[in-house]
Amino acid sequence: MRDAFICDGVRTPVGRYGGALSAVRTDDLGAVPLRALLDRYPQLDLERIDDVIFGCANQAGEDNRNVARMSALLAGLPQTVSGTTINRLCGSGLDAIGFAARAIKAGDGDLLMAGGVESMSRAPFVMGKATAAFQRQAEIFDTTIGWRFVNPLMHQQFGTDSMPETAENVAELLNISRADQDAFALRSQQRTALAQQNGILAQEIVPVRVPGKKGTVTEFIVDEHPRAEITLEQLSGLKTPFRKNGVVTAGNASGVNDGAAALIIASEKMALAQGLIPRTRIVAMATAGVEPRLMGLGPVPATRRVLERAGLSINDMDVIELNEAFAAQALGVLRQLGLPDDAAHVNPNGGAIALGHPLGMSGARLALAASNELHRRNGRYALCTMCIGVGQGIAMILERV
């Protein structure tokens, strides 16, 4: 079986909800990192690109009808290059990379572009059609995040806890304190601030040209969700709106954000033929299901499964990128895997609590960050893992070349 490699990747800055990227359509946003990679590697024979695979969780607005294909065309890829959109909710971007890797390993492709995009700012309101004549009970949903058009049987059998409520469930089950969650959130902010100061995050980012009033254009180049100056006192003073006497706050949870990322995935032979450098081998990937009300613990079985497939242990990992949907679930995962709360190799440059969590993009961001960090610290293996709404987890192991 052939190996698949990450050759390079870029991402946009992550925008706040209603922030700098809210003026950019989702399909245009997805085109930005694709176009940047094409500009970086003008020698690429674009006709040899087998597919563009993007993750996107919403797909109810401008990201509808296969946003990967739309973004590929808008980026200037030939019409002969196909595109498909993956939806595994929060894990979509990482899953897209996995699909690309499997295509190469199976001999169904040699050169692919994979990543993800999400504009939560531009998520629309949706309304279902009437199911009977003269029906006047139309439901309207904000598609930014969470459940919509719920099947009554799903609600009866599994519940429909909101994402913050699932984090409260994990905290209650594993006795994770508010103080520990706020301390974790502060570390995320501090590590992100240091990575910004040291130019580490800038190495991943390509600018987005944002249209303004009267034809003006602004270049957006810096993640805008981090709060570098926040203190533990401020975090501990935030309200817990999701449950009475709860522990989950806006400060120890990830944000609602906008962004896009893309990576070049290739076989070794094709990479060398196209003037690319294989940087990181995609070793293995796994997914797993858990109880939906405890969705935040999904990375635990997914990680155990991918480690078993790779013949490795958690102690072999030099870098771990664990998506910080909530401090409660991130701490739950770390403790279940036998890792300390403040492990230096876990999210060394911060995570989603500080950077934000554009759902379809986040997994691709994790893979890009892990690949780059392996090379920075001369490590060998990295783990990327995420929880997923409705009770799933996804995990991928990378190896530095």
Predicted segments, located by residue:
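Conserved active-site "lid/cap" helical segment
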Residues: M1-S71, A75, T166-R178, S188, ...
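Flexible glycine-/small-residue-enriched beta->alpha junction loops
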Residues: L111-N169
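N-terminal extracellular/periplasmic Venus flytrap/periplasmic-binding protein-like
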Residues: R11-T12, A23, D27-V32, Q43, ...
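Active-site pocket-lining segment
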Residues: E168, E204, G212, V283-A354
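Condensing-enzyme catalytic core mediating Claisen C-C bond formation in acyl metabolism
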Residues: M1-T26, I145, I230-L297, P301, ...
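Conserved catalytic cysteine-centered active-site region
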Residues: V24, C56-L112, T144-W147, Q157-M163, ...
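Active-site-proximal alpha-helical scaffold in enzymes
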Residues: I86-E118, A171-I200, A262-K269, L334-R335, ...
